[in-house]
């Protein structure tokens, strides 16, 4: 999330040259329009969600409705939030602009049944488990466990504010209610409701006391006879003032048709149905036959550690038959295995004489019991009589560490006078000893769904699991560390070896609505069912332009990361060439394309069926570009390359596949073709729009209660003084495609923004991009944007312009009822031949001249490539006047000193020129003229002297040039007016002179050394009608020295224009000095 922006408030001018391509962090780039030519540009904002655990941006599979259509000033983006602990924050940014909005709770959970005040319950679901689906009349209690799925188990702060759950059991028109409150780290509670006996059917016939038969799930004996059905529902309600939920309540009584309470105000949510039955009467003891004469009886229930077990020995009926051995005297040998201790024996009847001997060993204990008939009469026949009780044996169950164990007791009978029974006929009694009397186990997952993004990222997605046990007395225990587990299909879902979480690793190939993992505890087992969503393959890859071409006239520097394989050169040589010539080391720019990857998460409805269920419905595509960004590949890196995770650029002509590969197996998850053509396109239009601020709004997406639609609108009007604005820039190509300027690196171009009316708005360069600053109210095409090639590729003294465009601007102080939208579709002005046009001036790159049609002076500010990220601006565009910083004060003071120095220099020059301009030349006949100043004197000779009237005073260090006669002189010898001229000596020996009078004369130096000199001498004119003339310095060529021409014919004579000797010598000396 972008931090809160500070500094100069308000909006700023967007140089999209430094926008989305350099945006930070896992911001979510705005999705481009569907592939193909775009009719108009789209506001290139970037969305980013924070404070979420699992969320996706979406796109409609069908064309968007007009309500969500995008334009150059509006951008809509749907998204969905699956998992979050707090309210998400949506940030939208455009260059330096950024605004955020908290997603309202009503948008995240529009119809949540689990409502907790001041608590976010997104994706929370109340799950209900029926402990026993068959309820016997002997235990007429229905038990239902409730827990909250989708909640973070580490979130302990909410446990004190969880609601109550009320169970409603209905049988015909009768109802029974019972409540409990969700609590604890797992947010669970167990509801127990006692059912009336009238709800159960008639009793079933009695069954013999045989060994207990268990149902397949090991929870309950199978019901026999006809069962009755009862329906279970639940409601949620807030606890009372004391924090309780109220006890169980029953209807008006058995058989009464009306309910005792008014219907609840909360919606009834169905749980399921249970079966009610009357089991046959069952004895509490189970019988085991030791042989045909003797039997034992023991309790029909599991045993607990430390419990004393009493086993009774009986003489079975029909035991005195002729085939049976005599039972009047026998010896019973008992061996108890480790974990069972034989405490003692005692006679249960005076008719039997019992003596015993006990031996306790390290591994087992044994007892030898001698039993004899105590009466003098023989044992009477037992036909038709019940069992005869003989003796009682007491055993103690020892402690153990496991949850349940099996203990064995071996029985051996030796009849006196008869051989022992074969070993195979020896009886063995097996006892079950348990730590707790568990009637059911239930696996609970923190969430009921898994979105298998591991297929795309290679990162495991895991869901924690807890297994709880429910005892007969209603106690709930955590037995997660004591269970065993196994996945029914590891191609869908897996489970950890410690059974503490289920996961997907990315190697799965399908999903399921009821993926099952089985957990086992002792003889009990229970399944955990999950919904697993997998991405639909192949992935859908969208390119904004699948055919990339070179752009005419757009030259960019050849950099190592862009250079084609065929053009690779030594980097040092390239840098040297770039310094030598701006046209070398550059190549034509290739078009760029944005890319996005979409998919749909789906699953199968049930095992063995092909019915496909799509998450969020078939109308939505989920964007997964960020998830697969590390696994994108360009098939041929010589043809194209990836600028970043969302941009492709061409390198050389060819066709290459662009694909997304699996992070685990390198299999191709999605693929599309990219073509780089040899054809060239030109920039037909540069489109620019002013963006003064951004407005973000959130609302439910039409037709879907789960998705949210974010809409960003750009405001164009600058509404207060010194407000800053930015530009949104788009390029239109001759092939019909458009692209934001932000797709291209700022080092590949230059952007010049000029203000055509500085009274209304100015352009400044405070940051890494130009900003438009409001100065006064006004509207119209007050700005001008000019796109040029990179400075390193500019030709000498030329500026190659790619495109120009006027930009509409409106400054109105005060808030309008609605912000008018300006659209300036007028074509830009690209240079001929793809924009390689020279600018209207010879200034260096980066300077700008006002457009000829501009109504006032224009200023320009070139865009330089930014070297750092955008500086922060205030979130929400709260703009306030700012004071000058210390740095700015120092810079302004330094600028003022420079301006003052320049002003003083100019005033001095003007005074100097005006002072000597009005001096007059002395009258004719004066023998000397004093030159009051000489700008330059360089030479090795002595001051020159010229004979006659042309000689200067002795005090002058440099002689003056001879005066020419005026152009309208008379042959009668009227007085000639001398003018002092400017003599400009140049390094090549040439000099500029008057258009009418130019002459050359050789000059000789009176010294042995020669130097060339530039000097200028000013003097005054005798009248305002006279103009300055130039006296040229002679060439070194001897032939030219002999052909000097003069403007006064009476000086050289009527026949041949030759120079007087004195003047000839004078000119030669000047030549030598020059």
Swiss-Prot record:
Q: Does the keyword Membrane apply?
A: yes
Q: Where is the composition biased (Low complexity)?
A: 841-862, 972-984
InterPro entries xrefs? Ig_TMEM132_2nd, Ig_TMEM132_5th, Ig_TMEM132_6th, TMEM132, TMEM132_3rd, TMEM132_C, TMEM132_M, TMEM132_N
Instruction: Give coiled-coil spans as residue ranges.
Output: none
Give the UniProt entry's GO cellular component terms: cell body; membrane
Q: Membrane side Extracellular: which residues?
A: 26-893
Q: For this UniProt entry, what is the primary localization, expressed as one broad class?
A: membrane
Segments spanning the bilayer are 894-914
The UniProt entry's sequence similarity note says: Belongs to the TMEM132 family.
- PANTHER family assigned to the protein according to its UniProt record, in alphabetical order: DETONATOR, ISOFORM E, TRANSMEMBRANE PROTEIN 132E
Q: Which disease is it linked to?
A: TMEM132E is located in a region involved in a heterozygous deletion of approximately 4.7 Mb; this deletion, involving the NF1 gene and contiguous genes lying in its flanking regions, is observed in a patient with 17q11.2 microdeletion syndrome, a syndrome characterized by variable facial dysmorphism, intellectual disability, developmental delay, and an excessive number of neurofibromas.
Please give the function described in this protein's UniProt entry.
Required for normal inner ear hair cell function and hearing.
- UniProt-recorded name of the protein: Transmembrane protein 132E
Native source species? Homo sapiens
């Amino acid at each position: 999330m972008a931090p809160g922006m500070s500094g100069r408030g308000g909006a700023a001018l967007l140089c999209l040259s430094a926008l989305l391509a350099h945006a930070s962090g896992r911001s979510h780039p705005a999705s481009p329009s569907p592939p193909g030519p775009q009719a108009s540009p789209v506001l290139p904002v970037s969305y980013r969600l924070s404070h979420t655990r699992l969320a996706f941006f979406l796109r409609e599979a069908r064309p968007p409705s007009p309500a969500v259509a995008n334009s150059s000033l509006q951008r809509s983006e749907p998204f969905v939030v699956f998992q979050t602990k707090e309210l998400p924050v949506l940030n939208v940014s455009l260059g330096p602009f950024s605004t955020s909005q908290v997603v309202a709770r009503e948008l995240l959970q529009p119809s949540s049944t689990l409502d907790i005040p001041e608590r976010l319950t997104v994706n929370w679901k109340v799950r209900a488990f029926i402990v026993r689906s068959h309820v016997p009349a002997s235990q007429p209690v229905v038990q239902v466990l409730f827990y909250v799925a989708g909640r973070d188990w580490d979130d302990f702060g909410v446990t004190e504010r969880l609601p109550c759950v009320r169970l409603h059991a209905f049988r015909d028109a009768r109802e029974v209610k019972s409540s409990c409150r969700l609590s604890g780290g797992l947010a669970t509670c167990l509801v127990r409701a006692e059912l009336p006996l009238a709800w159960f059917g008639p009793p079933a016939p009695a069954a013999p006391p045989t060994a207990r038969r268990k149902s397949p799930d090991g929870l309950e004996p199978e019901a026999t006879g006809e069962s009755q059905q009862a329906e279970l529902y639940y409601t949620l309600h807030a606890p009372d003032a004391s924090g309780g939920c109220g006890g169980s309540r029953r209807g008006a009584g058995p058989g009464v048709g009306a309910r005792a309470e008014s219907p609840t105000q909360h919606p009834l949510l169905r749980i399921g149905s249970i079966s009610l039955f009357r089991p046959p009467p069952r004895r509490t003891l189970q019988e085991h036959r030791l042989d045909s004469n003797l039997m034992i009886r023991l309790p029909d229930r599991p045993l607990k550690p430390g419990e004393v077990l009493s086993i009774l020995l009986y003489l079975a009926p029909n035991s005195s038959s002729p085939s049976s051995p005599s039972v009047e005297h026998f010896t019973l040998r008992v061996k108890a295995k480790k974990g069972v201790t034989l405490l003692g024996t005692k006679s249960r009847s005076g008719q039997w004489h019992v003596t015993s001997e006990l031996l306790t060993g390290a591994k087992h204990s044994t007892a030898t019991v001698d039993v004899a008939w105590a009466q003098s009469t023989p044992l009477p026949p037992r036909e038709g009589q019940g069992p005869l009780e003989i003796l009682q044996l007491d055993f103690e169950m020892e402690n153990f560490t496991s949850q349940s164990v099996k203990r064995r007791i071996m029985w051996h009978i030796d009849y006196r006078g008869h051989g022992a029974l074969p070993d195979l006929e020896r009886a063995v009694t097996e006892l079950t000893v348990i730590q707790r009397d568990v009637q059911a186990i239930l696996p609970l997952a923190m969430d009921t769904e898994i979105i298998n993004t591991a297929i795309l990222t290679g990162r495991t997605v895991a869901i924690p699991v807890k297994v709880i046990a429910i005892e007969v007395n209603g106690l709930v225990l955590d037995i997660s560390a004591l269970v065993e587990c196994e996945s029914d299909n590891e191609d869908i879902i897996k489970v950890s070896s410690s059974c503490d979480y289920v996961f997907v690793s990315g190697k799965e190939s399908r999903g399921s609505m009821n993926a099952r993992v089985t957990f086992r505890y002792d003889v009990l087992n229970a399944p955990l069912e999950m919904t697993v969503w997998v991405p639909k393959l192949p992935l859908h890859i969208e390119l904004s332009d699948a055919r990339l071409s070179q752009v005419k006239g757009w030259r960019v520097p050849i950099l190592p990361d862009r250079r084609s394989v065929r053009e690779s050169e030594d980097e040092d040589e390239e840098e040297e060439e770039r310094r030598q010539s701006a046209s070398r080391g550059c190549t034509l720019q290739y078009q760029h394309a944005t890319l996005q990857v979409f998919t749909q998460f789906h699953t199968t409805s049930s095992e063995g069926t092909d019915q496909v269920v799509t998450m969020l419905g078939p109308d939505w595509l989920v964007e997964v570009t960020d998830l697969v960004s590390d696994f994108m590949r360009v098939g041929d890196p010589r043809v194209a390359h990836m600028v970043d995770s969302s941009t492709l650029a061409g390198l050389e002509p060819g066709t290459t596949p662009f694909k997304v590969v699996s992070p685990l197996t390198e299999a191709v998850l999605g693929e599309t073709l990219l073509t780089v053509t040899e054809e060239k396109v030109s920039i037909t239009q540069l489109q620019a729009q002013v963006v003064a601020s951004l407005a973000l709004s959130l609302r439910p997406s039409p037709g879907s209660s789960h998705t949210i639609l974010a809409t960003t609108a750009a405001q164009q009007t600058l509404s207060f003084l010194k407000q800053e604005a930015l530009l949104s820039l788009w390029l239109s190509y001759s092939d019909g495609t458009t692209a934001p300027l932000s797709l291209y690196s700022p080092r590949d171009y230059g952007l010049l923004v000029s203000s055509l009316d500085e009274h209304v708005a100015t352009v400044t360069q405070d940051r890494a991009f130009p900003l438009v600053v409001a100065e006064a109210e006004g509207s119209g095409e007050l700005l001008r944007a000019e796109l040029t090639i990179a400075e390193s590729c500019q030709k000498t003294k030329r500026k190659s312009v790619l495109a120009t465009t006027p930009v509409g601007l409106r400054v109105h102080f005060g808030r309008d009822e609605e912000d008018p939208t300006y659209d300036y579709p007028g074509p830009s002005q690209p240079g001929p031949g793809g924009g390689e046009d020279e600018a209207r001036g010879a200034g260096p790159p980066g300077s700008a001249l006002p457009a000829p049609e501009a109504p006032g002076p224009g200023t320009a500010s070139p865009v330089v490539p930014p070297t750092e990220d955008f500086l922060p601006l205030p979130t929400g565009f709260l703009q306030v006047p700012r004071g000058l910083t210390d740095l700015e004060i120092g810079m302004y003071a330094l600028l003022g000193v420079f301006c003052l120095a320049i002003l003083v220099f100019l005033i001095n020059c003007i005074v100097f020129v005006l002072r000597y301009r009005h001096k007059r030349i002395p009258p004719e006949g004066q023998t000397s003229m004093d030159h009051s100043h000489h700008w330059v004197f360089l030479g090795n000779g002595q001051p020159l002297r010229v004979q006659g009237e042309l000689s200067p005073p002795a005090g002058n260090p440099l002689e003056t040039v001879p005066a020419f006669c005026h152009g309208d002189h008379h042959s009668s010898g009227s007085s000639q007016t001398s003018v002092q001229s400017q003599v400009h000596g140049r390094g090549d020996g040439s000099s500029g002179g008057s258009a009418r009078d130019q002459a050359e004369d050789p000059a000789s130096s009176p010294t042995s050394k020669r130097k060339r000199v530039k000097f200028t001498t000013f003097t005054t004119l005798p009248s305002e009608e006279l103009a300055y003339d130039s006296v040229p310095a002679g060439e070194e060529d001897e032939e030219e020295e002999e052909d000097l021409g003069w403007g006064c014919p009476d000086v050289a004579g009527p026949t041949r224009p030759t120079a007087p000797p004195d003047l000839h010598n004078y000119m030669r000396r000047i030549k030598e000095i020059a």
